[in-house]
Swiss-Prot record:
GO cellular component, one term: nucleus
Domain of life: Eukaryota
Name assigned to this protein: Nucleoside diphosphate-linked moiety X motif 6
Gene behind this protein: Nudt6
A molecular function (GO) term: hydrolase activity
Domain named Nudix hydrolase: residues: 138-270
Subunit structure comment from the entry: Monomer and homodimer.
Annotated compartments: Cytoplasm; Nucleus; Mitochondrion
Xref: PANTHER family: NUCLEOSIDE DIPHOSPHATE-LINKED MOIETY X MOTIF 6 (PTHR13994:SF46), NUDIX HYDROLASE RELATED (PTHR13994)
Entry function: May contribute to the regulation of cell proliferation.
Length: 313
């Protein structure tokens, strides 16, 4: 989809701009030649391949001690230069200890794009028409692990301590930045129950908009099928009220569970009876279009003959 492609482009831009540093004598976004100590004269930035410019205030040491009014004049001059140079957007990265620069930037049209623990990023669209810059992350990702033991036909479930209703559910939690889905499921299961497990497949994906647990944003909740590597329960009493191995058929029938847990339990029951190939989304690592990067692709099992087949076969 168009917004996915555009977001990929701009996020690659952010990653590039965040990792690169201008060296003495390199051409800058202002069009001048950067030399040590020149930052006080003009606000230097880094160009990206889409025609935008990124400015990291943490790299401008001469800004320390500068008042808001002086910074506004400096930024205003830079904006005029960027417009003259045909730049289409500006990204302003402000450390938390320089937050007094946010107000003058906002007075010149900058808006918040996103924030991290120690910095915020503001944007200004300089191109024609409405802004075409993508928003920041639209979803949070939660992952649960359905640890199912085929030999005993039991599945591991918990009851959350801080819920209004004591409903059985699969252990899980939020994925950490840069953490794979499978790793999140295994980690969360161990942290909540003390049971070690191994990833087998992805079973389901739930998307919920305006989620209260995601600060009103959208929430993605993925349930993975895991195979147990240990069976002794030592659950986290801060998070869980109960933790048990429950017969799968009983879990599929009970009313004391969440709708998604009930549905996944029935999915597991179907897989047990008819074959897990009917329900599993397997994972394979493939090379990304970005050099040196890889991604995980989840889909129904594809025969090896089709993996190697060409369009003419």
């Amino acid at each position: 989809m168009w917004w996915v492609r555009r977001t990929r482009y701009w996020f690659s831009t952010l990653l590039y701009a965040g990792g690169a540093r201008l060296r003495p004598g390199r051409r800058t976004a202002s069009g001048g030649l950067e030399t040590p100590g020149s930052c006080g004269a003009e606000l230097q930035g880094e160009l990206d391949r889409f025609g935008g410019v990124s400015v990291h205030l943490s790299r401008h040491h001469t800004l320390h001690g500068l008042d808001a009014a002086a910074f506004r004049r400096l930024l205003q001059a830079a904006i005029q230069q960027w417009r003259s140079d045909g730049r289409i957007a500006a990204w302003l990265h402000i450390p938390i200890l320089q937050s007094h620069f946010i107000a003058p930037a906002a007075s010149l049209g900058f808006c918040f794009h996103h924030a991290k623990p120690h910095s915020s990023t503001l944007t200004l669209w300089l191109g024609e028409g409405p802004s075409r810059l993508p928003g920041y992350a639209t979803h949070q990702v939660g992952v649960a692990g359905a640890v199912f033991d085929v030999s005993t036909r039991k599945v591991l479930v918990v009851q959350d301590r801080n819920k209004l209703k004591n409903m059985w559910k699969f252990p899980g939690g939020l994925s950490e930045p840069g953490e794979d889905i499978a790793d999140t499921a295994v980690r969360e299961v161990f942290e909540e129950t003390g049971v070690k497990s191994e990833f087998r497949s992805l079973l389901s994906i739930r998307q919920q908009h305006r989620s209260p647990g995601a600060f009103g944003m959208s929430d993605m909740y993925l349930v993975c099928r895991l195979q147990p590597r240990s069976f002794t329960i030592n659950f986290c009493q801060q998070e869980c009220l109960k933790c048990e191995w429950i017969d799968l058929e009983n879990l599929a029938r009970t009313k004391h569970t969440t709708p998604i847990t009930s549905r996944v339990a029935r999915l597991l029951l179907y897989g047990l009876r008819e074959g897990f190939d009917k329900i599993d989304l397997s994972m394979e690592e493939l090379p990304a279009v970005y050099t040196g990067l890889f991604y995980k692709l989840y889909h129904r099992e594809l025969p090896e003959s089709y993996k190697a087949a060409t369009g003419a076969d």
